[in-house]
Design a protein with these regions (language model features):
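Acidic, low-complexity cytosolic segments
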Residues: 3-150
């Protein structure tokens, strides 16, 4: 999600048929961007200098967020209590820095359409899923880890 709340990358890694469609994903990203901005204000947050919402826990999934210093937000929708999601988000940020930001043809704040970026993100997701495969038993999130990244 870019600084304006626009979706610049989305990939669904779940084999589950009951996932959000692209329109719902756009709405979720937009709402999250707004809530994240509101939560950073001192009038709302009980914590001084709050960095905003980092985790939303629901009864069926968790939504994690990592915001970079440049304002780009990486979000992962995962199975409840997934382990190592923060590590995955930081790895995706590294991939973003290496394969989007260093790409002379990539325009900041625009959708990322780089095949190598997508391949490396997939490798990061698979690596984290493999590392966590023993912690979960089936259901949602396709293997118990990240089901969507945006």
């Amino acid at each position: 999600v870019n600084k304006s709340g626009g979706l610049i990358f989305y990939k669904n890694y779940s084999s589950d048929k009951n996932t959000l469609d692209i329109n719902d994903t756009l709405r979720l990203a937009s709402v999250w961007h707004s809530l994240h901005a509101i939560s950073r204000t001192n009038s709302v947050s009980p914590v001084k200098k709050s960095s905003g919402i980092e985790l939303l826990e629901t009864s069926t999934f968790d939504l994690h967020c990592f915001e970079t210093k440049t304002g780009i937000k990486f979000m992962v929708c995962s199975m409840k209590k997934a382990i190592g999601v923060e590590r995955l988000l930081r790895r995706v940020y590294d991939v973003y820095a290496d394969f989007a930001m260093k790409n002379p043809f990539y325009e900041l704040e625009q959708p990322i359409q780089a095949e190598l970026f997508e391949e490396r993100v997939m490798i990061a997701v698979k690596s984290c899923r493999n590392a966590n495969s023993g912690h979960y038993s089936g259901g949602g999130g396709g293997g118990g880890y990240a089901s969507s990244l945006y």
